[in-house]
Amino acid sequence: MSLSRVCLLTSLTSLTSLVAGALIAPLPPLSYAAAPLPPVSTACGRDTDPAWAPTSTRFGEADGYAPYAGNGYLAHRVPATGAGYAASGEKTGWPLFTPRYDGAFVSGLFGRDKDLAAGREVAAALPSWTTLDVRVGNETYGSATPAGRISHYRQTVFLRCGLVRTSLRWTTADGRATDLTYEVLADRSDVHTGAVRLRMTPHWSGTATVTGRLDPRGARRLTLNGDGTFRTQGTGTAGAIAQTMRTGGSEPGQSTPPLRSTHRVRAGRTYTFEKYVGVDTALTSSAPRTAAREASRRAARRGWSGVLAANAAAWRRAWAADISVPDSPQLQKWLRSAQYGLLASTRTGSRDSIAPAGLTSDNYAGMVFWDAEIWMYPGLLVTHPELARSVVEYRYRTRGAARTNARMLGFRGLFYPWTSASKGNLWTECQSWDPPHCVTQNHLQGDVSLAVWQYYLATGDRDWLAGHGWPLLQGIADFWASRATANDDGSYSVKEVAGPDEYSNGVTDGVFTNAVAATALRNATRAAQLLGHPAPAEWTRVADGLRIPYDPKRKLFLQYAGYNGSTIKQADTVLLIYPLEWPMEPGARASTLDYYAARTDPDGPAMTDSVHAIDAAAIGAPGCATYTYLQRAVRPFMRGPYALFSEARGAKSGAQDPLSGFPAEDFLTGKGGFLQVFTHGLTGLRLREDGVRLDPLLPPQLGKGVTLTGLRYRGRTYDIAIGPLTTTVRLTSGAPFTVHTPTGPRLLTGTLTLATRRPDLASTTDAARCRPATATSETPGLYAAAAVDGSPATSWSPDGATGTLTVDLGRAAPVTSIEPEWTDGRLSSYRLETSVNGTDWQPYGAGAVARQVRLTVTSDDAEKPVGVRELRVAQP
């Protein structure tokens, strides 16, 4: 044994209780290299592209919206300090109302706290496993380090390989400066493994102490033991977390109790410390302690370069499906962040579903809602069916509890709780009892059935349909047949329900509820035919007889029987258009979209405008409302340098919801909806038993087009490139298949060329329609482009009493009229001006030659400013 090894081992001392739970190996001989730091690994690809590597250069800039590393099983928020635990004073919303923190989570792990959420199951959290403390003199670098002691700051999320890197200079009170670089990943190639690397370059010589530990402050709803084992509170799930440490290329040491090591360091030399973490529970292993220890050692044997390379390769495979928007770098960044969020919270082979915030936090207690089936699942299904499968496998896994739930409620078949956790038990897991959404949000049953049928359509897996899909389709159909009430006229009603609009409770014949119920009954009947099973006649009878509230004079579907036009919280009736594809007479889709889009609470959850965008694309009304809704689906909700998604525009989600609190983030529900605008909205993609349907559309604001690569259908892979005039569909692997188009079915054998719909080019007398528009200020969600998109349901509003809207008409010509259509509110005054060059302006006079027009509006109430639904301009 070398002298340096002897000195190192003899300096090790046991850690205090702060390192409880660590299964940790000692550091081999300390390695160092001359400064500067080693070159950045190239495994992450184009790590300077902002769309692939969002970056913060200001310490604390991302407070409340910290980045994360995740692999679908294991995930960790990474605080501004680069590793360890951090918390804020802000509280989460319903049902926890607890302080937010940068936590570590494991898929499917739940616990119970009698003093929290009425003692029902909520997500458990691990101790923070990324901690590698550095102590110099009497100071320790960590979450308590003052911002004034930190400089040269840079934190980057390498989306291409799921790596978070934080580099900075830490200066102690006595002036000693040390460069620190932390790198954190959750290995996608070996999902029970996480890894942390610290590179330390002191600009002084002396003594430094490095501590690898598990921080118990991060643990929630579990009891942690000194040997690294734990057990969740209330649910009794056993688990373990193990650590192995090494430096440089040395071999890892043997597992020992927690350690602290003190080293002599020299100025200008770089010292490398690596920590490999293994995590397992009784949910996935019969011997979680042994499995966790082996996962940790397995990673340590591979070393940092091996782990990083394998992880990056796994991420490269995941990124084979991508969306490219060359005209908009900002939109591109948002798209990549949205995809990363879903990928980091899903994995192949999982039987756990996706919570609204995935594995990024315990927002919404980590519960599973309809968010999974309706908002996150569809985009995954057409790009990563192997990941999407976890959503429906979770429902299959929890079907036993669903059957018990139905029986105890007095119904046949299966009944899934509005929110569920480990097993799907209505009474020990569902959180929403006042109002009683646990038993009235019945549309969830139809949402689950729809997802099951969509999985079959996307994969064509008849064996899965017979073994896993059919029991769910049959059980849910039986539920609806027993839930519906026969009326005297032979029709059927579903009473005492709450639809997706959570502002309406205890209603009769919710239109989406009844429509999705009928769809579930019909899909079950079709599955029975495919599998050779008898289908009860009552399934068809109830499906055909369910009342669908509709006003034929207005061509308007009513949200429920007796609906009076009140404000709604979120998308409800508009879901008939997509994803249900409910049959409608001409004009009904447009009437329904416009009516409900104008009545949706602007403070409602983030996903609503994504379905508005998809609906608008499907309708294709003259104008460019699709882009308005696309902007509304993402711009108001993006937060921080890493483009995390907030649940709401402001500080509260749903102004009329007494249970709402600080908005959830990273809100994967919103990200999933946003992605569907591209996968299903702009492409017009719909799944069929004998192929896919495509009907592409391109908003003018995305003039160079949109390309989707790596789309999947029944074992095939294909790309769609939507251009300004035509769309190219290219088969990249697999057998030919049918593409249904507006002109008829076509066989995709190599490439197909389809017409791209351009509703912005429809004939019009309005010279301002779909022209570039800007404003001096905008209320979030009420953007300038809305005033010229041709839709009466959208509008621009200034963010204050006064604002100016400017429209470029594209050519200088006489302007014969300018007509603003106002939103509600008290208008004080307005001014119209024109210009031929955008610099020199004069008051508008009929017939004046102009290329630009602008409108300045002043309102009496700065809190409720008047806006513009449409600014119409006439030119010969």
Regions found by a protein language model. Name each.
Residues 1-36:
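Secretory targeting and sorting signals
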Residues 19, 652, 755-812, 821-830, ...:
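Disordered, acidic Ser/Thr/Pro-rich linker "stalks" and the adjacent N-terminal cap
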Residues 36-365, 746-748, 756-760:
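Acidic/polar, glycine-enriched structural segments that form the non-catalytic walls/loops
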Residues 114-179, 433, 489, 623-774:
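Non-catalytic C-terminal accessory modules of carbohydrate-active enzymes
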Residues 346-360, 386-450, 456, 463-467, ...:
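Helix-terminus loop motifs that line ligand-binding clefts
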Residues 368-399, 450, 457-458, 467, ...:
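Active-site core of glycosidic bond-cleaving carbohydrate-active enzymes
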Residues 475, 479-531:
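Acidic/histidine-rich catalytic neighborhood
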Residues 855-863:
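Short beta-strand-plus-loop segments that form exposed binding edges in beta-rich domains
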